[in-house]
Amino acid sequence: MKFTGSMLLIVLTQVCSAQYYYKDLVTTRQNERRWSLYKENRVKSVKLSSFERDGKPAEGFTGDQEVSGESLTTHTKASGNAESWIVATYTPQGLTQKITDTSDTYRSASDYQYDADGRLQSILNTSIETDNHLRDVEQHIWTYDAAGKPSSMLKIKNGNDTTFVRFVLDEKGNVAEERAMRNKTDLPVIYYYYDTDSRLTDIVRYSLKAKRLLPDNIFEYGDDGRTSSMLVVPDGSNDYLKWLYDYNEKGLKSRESCISRQKELLGKIEYQYTYK
């Protein structure tokens, strides 16, 4: 099995379906913290190198990131996958402003809007499959309670398909449950679990097939507070992949290693930084 291909896409996305709280709020904050680290350490560019389980470079893979002004461009190309350019633009305050994802046959643009307190208010995504001219528009509209915690979200697709999402908080104010309804039908509940420091540890949903709660993701943290590993269960799979993270002295990610359920190394991605 080659490391590039579907597994490479998982390391770039790492988000299962639904998980609106994780995808819209948590992941966005993580990307903004990475951007802040890039700016703080005056990162100019990053080279991504992919290696197979035997340590040999992954054939046909190239990857790099370029920092220019208030934007970060990530370019990747892998055997069997379309060449991709992801451009993330940030406000002077470090908030995500726009993300575009472009390949030979696909283009997606997400515009972010915030309220006066800097809380995410709306994400408007427009995606186009250029080869067959299909166009989708999806908007996520967020609302918050008096304490500034997420209370609900509307997902509106193509102006006429609405999913209502509400959030249940735990005693510490963390989002504990994500309950969605579409066409008057309840969708599977997403559960979020945390450690004593309110760090996200598990994202779980009920499996109709297994008739029990099963994880989508499991997170672990090092003594420095950084994420040390993330377990990913691909949609519709009984298997999982686990990503192990290493960081350099500046707190920047230096390596991502992928291991299988059988604890076999499948491959790794290394990051080399150039500074201004």
Write out the residue ranges for each language-model feature.
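Bacterial Sec-dependent N-terminal signal peptides
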Residues: 1-23
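Buried hydrophobic residues that stabilize the cores of well-folded domains
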Residues: 19-276
